């Protein structure tokens, strides 16, 4: 998915590369068997994030993924002197800051089904032609939603989404192939639409306005309530009885609204510094290629041979947990080298890594899931 190019941070394509890794690229752990987490445990600065706070067990008990703190320090020693700007994204398809409620509705509905856009069996991406251009991956999803709205389909109304049929949804997402995971997306829209219809007059902007203008605020923050009221956003995994929180899509949707609307005074968020990275497919690849993370031989082989890694498996949890852990450490090390007026927050590191590595031909892990 092209989260920064167009609708910015929304989405992540599960593209399958046919690339065969070269031996001179980052090697697996030299010690045979399992990976260790870190030789000497370091922990990111406390930013008040329940997501980071939940990672301790996953990091400390890791078997197959390791984070190299010394490499983080090394990378930070030069990355700190890059601009690393706060992203300012443009709203798509003529959406305007002049109508922030429509922007909120569009972004959050799209975010709710912003999952795999590649057919896992055929390795074919979802694509569509719209408005004189060719779109693929998540951009094709957004184009389809705009096309439906232009044709009078009330796709941003929860009352419609709660009852949308499979044929209707298939028509909305008419493209080169059937929308991947169409049935799962249908179930998500029914769930989200039902909550919106019953509690928020069918609109996501009513939900957003009813929340505290914070990510976390004693249960009334935007993320607090998204994961509580909309189960599809409750992106958590259990590892040996420990709950590990990731919250990729809820954080991503709110981050995009903040990045597009806050400068115009159309979206207030008082605690963006509590955001983590967005644990997806591409940022782990960036960390791997930079030598910040390393994998056991078994995991490395599974990824490089395009084996499906099950959702909620130890492998998947460790990959995502180390993504969040190492990017938080990197932000901290970068800030040690930057002046007070140029301090960054973790999503700026995420943006830097995703932008530079989303077109890499190095294989990423493959997990069929509605969570990212």
Model feature map: region roles:
Residues 1, 21-39:
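C-terminal segment of N-terminal export signals and the immediately downstream linker at the start
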Residues 5-28:
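N-terminal export signals
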Residues 14-18, 200, 291, 334:
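A generic secondary-structure signal for well-formed alpha-helical elements
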Residues 31-247, 294, 301, 357-372:
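Phosphate/adenylate-binding glycine loop and adjacent helical scaffold
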Residues 250-254:
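Amphipathic alpha-helical elements of HEAT/ARM-like alpha-solenoid repeat scaffolds that form extended
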Residues 255-372:
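Accessory, usually C-terminal, subdomains that scaffold auxiliary metal cofactors
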């Amino acid at each position: 998915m092209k989260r920064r190019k167009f609708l910015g941070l929304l989405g992540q394509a599960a593209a399958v590369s046919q690339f065969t890794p070269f031996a001179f690229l980052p090697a697996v752990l030299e010690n045979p068997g399992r990976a260790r987490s870190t030789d000497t445990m370091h922990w990111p600065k406390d930013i008040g994030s329940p997501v980071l706070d939940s990672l301790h067990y996953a990091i400390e008990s890791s078997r197959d993924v390791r984070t190299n703190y010394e490499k983080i320090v090394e990378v930070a020693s030069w990355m700190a002197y890059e601009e690393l700007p706060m992203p300012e994204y443009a709203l798509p398809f003529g959406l305007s800051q002049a109508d922030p409620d429509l922007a909120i509705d569009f972004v959050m509905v799209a975010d709710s089904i912003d999952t795999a856009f590649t057919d896992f069996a055929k390795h074919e991406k979802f694509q569509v032609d719209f408005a004189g251009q060719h779109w693929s991956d998540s951009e094709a999803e957004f184009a389809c939603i705009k096309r439906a709205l232009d044709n009078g389909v009330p796709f941003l109304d929860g009352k419609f989404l709660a009852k949308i049929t499979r044929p209707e949804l298939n028509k909305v997402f008419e493209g080169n192939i059937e929308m991947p995971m169409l049935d799962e997306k249908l179930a998500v829209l029914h769930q989200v639409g039902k909550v919106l219809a019953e509690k928020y007059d069918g609109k996501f902007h009513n939900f957003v306005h009813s929340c505290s203008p914070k990510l976390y605020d004693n249960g009334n923050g935007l993320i607090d309530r998204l994961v509580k009221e909309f189960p599809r956003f409750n992106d958590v995994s259990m590892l040996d009885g420990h709950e590990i929180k990731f919250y990729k899509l809820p954080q991503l949707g709110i981050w995009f609204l903040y990045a597009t609307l806050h400068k115009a005074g159309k979206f207030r968020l008082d605690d963006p510094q509590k955001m983590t990275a967005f644990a997806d497919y591409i940022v782990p690849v960036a960390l791997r290629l930079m030598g910040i993370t390393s994998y056991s031989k078994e995991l490395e082989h599974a990824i490089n041979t395009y084996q499906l890694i099950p959702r909620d498996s130890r492998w998947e949890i460790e990959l995502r947990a180390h993504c969040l852990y190492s990017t938080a450490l990197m932000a901290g090390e970068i800030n040690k080298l930057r002046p007070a007026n140029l301090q960054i927050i973790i999503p700026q590191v995420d943006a830097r890594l995703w932008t530079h590595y989303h077109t890499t031909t190095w294989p990423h892990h493959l997990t069929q899931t509605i969570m990212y």
